[in-house]
Swiss-Prot record:
Binding site for Mn(2+) 2: D416, D427, E539
Residues given in the record as Mn(2+) 1 binding sites: D427, E525, E539
InterPro entries: Creatin/AminoP/Spt16_N, Creatinase/aminopeptidase-like, Creatinase_N, Pept_M24, Pept_M24B, Peptidase_M24_C, Peptidase_M24B_aminopep-P_CS, X-Pro_aminopeptidase_P
Record's keyword terms, sorted: Aminopeptidase, Hydrolase, Manganese, Metal-binding, Metalloprotease, Protease
PROSITE patterns in the cross-refs: PROLINE_PEPTIDASE (PS00491)
Pfam family, one: Creatinase_N
Organism of this sequence: Tuber melanosporum (strain Mel28)
Protein name in UniProt: Probable Xaa-Pro aminopeptidase P
Amino acid sequence: METVDTTSRLAKLRELMKRERVDVYVVPSEDAHSSEYICAADARRAFISGFTGSAGCAIVTQEKAALSTDGRYFNQAARQLDENWELLKQGLPDVPTWQEWVAQQAEGGKNVGVDATVITAQQAKSLETRIKKKGGTSLLGIPNNLIDEVWGADRPNRPNNPVMVLDEKYSGKEFPLKIEAVRKELENKKSPGFVVSMLDEIAWLFNLRGTDIPYNPVFFSYAFISPESTTLYIDSSKLDEKVIAHLGSAVKIRPYHEIFDEIDLLAQKLKVGQPETDSKASEDGGKWLVSNKTSWALSKALGGDDAIEVIRSPVEEEKAVKNDTEKEGMKRCHIRDGAALTEYFAWLEDELLKGTKIDEVQAADKLEQIRSRGENFMGLSFDTISSTGPNAAVIHYKPEAGNCSVIDPKAIYLCDSGAQYLDGTTDTTRTLHFGEPTDMERKSYTLVLKGMIALDRAIFPKGTSGFALDILARQFLWSEGLDYRHGTGHGVGSFLNVHEGPFGIGTRIQYSEVALSPGMFVSNEPGYYEDGSFGIRIENIIMVKEVKTSHSFGDRPYFGFERVTMVPMCRKLIDAGLLTPAETEWLNSYHAEVFEKTHGFFEKDSLASKWLKRETTPI
């Protein structure tokens, strides 16, 4: 991980800030669609700060520059930021949030600026309130992104790749039925229309996929759904005859950038009593519906706070609960993916013990090569985290060719990887050791494993959130005074983004807002990290399902989890003496299931077959 000299970039930005009469400039990580993962052209925060992690916010004044990020990236940010930057370690005691830091810098009547397309309306409203409480003047939406001006001709071009139709045998539901579900929400709210701006929601809604953002099968677009019409805002050059036929005459196609002008016009017509249609919602004066992730710019175009109602997207909520076709596809692709990981780990162990020098990138490339032979493979779902020894302590470590470590067979190796398949998306982490682990490594691994098992075995009543379950995964680490600085679980899309909401398992308060429901796929990934020494993480994907219980208190159904990931744990790192009989039974049962579902992919006496049999032998 190299450090970038940001001195000249900051100097240019500060000159532009003077031109715009902005004292504090905010640079979020997200793009205009509030995407967690972005294309190279939208990596503005990374460009100005040098920090390449997926989460964080940069703030620049005439005298200071600060980067705020969460615990997943403390080590990485410390390595990548140069001397121009102050690192704000989000969540630590006495460390301000980026919003608090902005408000502090705005004291004394200063102006704060931001590109209104890359901050949500809710974030902008909250930030402006903080600024004014501290004596700042206002939050300004700057029309042109100042980072783009600093970047100039070196800024990468925005992708404009073709879109593909996802067959119903993978999606499980015709897209007009999905749109009708949105219209029911409009009817319930007496709303004249809903703007869909999240890229994965649009891809899911129309049963389309793309390649505009690496590892995420999405495409740049917006959608607008009214009680009578559906409009997709997209560059028409992305659509071939098959896609156009798939959408049919019921979907109007408009240029991508015209969304702002057209919804502004619709908003003006509605304001003066000339709605687009004769819909009852328009007559009743209902508000436009926007999701809580809609940009400030879009919200302002619709008329601002008085004209919009911010809701959790009904598309996001329906997408999170997989239908029967999606559930079966996710299970199948995880079995194939598990077989690929077994083949990879068997190969890696054999090569390392023979003395072959393999670096982290070479190993990751080999894993991708093995995966690519699998049925329905469409690419990776994120950059493979292939990390040896102390690099494994960097939670979202990204090895780079020519600047990475050779895998040490005497050290821990952490591999967090996933793939995109037509029938689903995978994300699996395994921590291995090819030599003799230390007592601390074995104890740490076993404590993490115990937490993962506890969450996997949980049974809970309807209405329970991931916030309530998070302690199950941390309890054994906490009992030793240990912990990890990341969430325990995130939602997973079906041939879509590897991270999806609106639910999750973790300590963030927003995880208390959405209950876990049958059909949701979520990761179970506790970990432990010793800076400069080693890192441990174990991750399975699990599916929420209804379970039978001997009683039903409150006449509520009870839920549990079904195991989806099929990859052995590392026997060498398990201290069996720390496991209870119930945990040992769980482990042996899981390994029996892994063997049963994946051994058929290998020749009887192959390297992978022998490795699988050894690693799944009961303890």
